[in-house]
Regions:
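Surface-exposed acidic/polar loop and edge beta-strand patches at domain peripheries
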Residues: 1-111, 115, 119-168
Length: 168
């Protein structure tokens, strides 16, 4: 099963085999948030950024507070067959996100399409960055490339200084 938020976000907030535990983090208690003065100065008083968890579309390069757009408003969406299109409000930073999630006719596969449009009128350099926040203590398996690239790498992993990938 898959659960997607439309009252905020959007986020894929739950992804699991029916009757099994959610593989994604769902921050129900809103423990992970940013309501710093710097964020409020930029986005407005009363604005708070919540991680919410799950899978979301972000932009790179990351910068503070610009990247931490409080996406706490309802999302425009349409459903057609096994496909949902989600369009949140344009951000103060001039980004218009569009996400399309397509469910396979059979099995548990979900195709994700992400798009960021620059609606600011300014020239902006960025890249779409899809983040998936997994639940602590779980095991995730990611398909690995089998491409024969000779002496060149065929897979890449990126970790931030605060990432902990230990099995402890």
């Amino acid at each position: 099963s898959i659960i997607i938020t439309v009252e905020v976000g959007p986020r894929i907030i739950s992804y699991c085999l029916n009757g099994h535990e959610n593989m994604l983090l769902e921050d129900v208690g809103r423990e992970f948030k940013d309501d710093s003065q710097e964020l409020r100065d930029y986005f407005g008083e009363g604005r708070t950024w919540y991680i919410y968890g799950g899978h979301r579309l972000w932009s790179s390069p990351e910068s503070y507070p610009h990247s931490y757009v409080p996406d706490n408003e309802p999302v425009e969406y349409t459903v057609s067959g096994g496909e949902i299109t989600l369009i949140p409000p344009a951000t103060r930073t001039g980004q218009q996100h569009r996400l399309i999630y397509r469910l396979a006719d059979e099995g548990s596969e979900v195709e994700l399409f992400h798009e960021i449009r620059n609606v600011s009128g300014a020239i902006v350099t960025l890249a779409p960055w899809a983040l998936t926040v997994c639940a602590a203590g779980g095991v995730e398996i990611f398909p690995q490339s089998q491409a024969d690239n000779g002496l060149l790498s065929n897979r890449r992993n990126v970790f931030w200084s605060y990432s902990d990938i230990s099995d402890d």
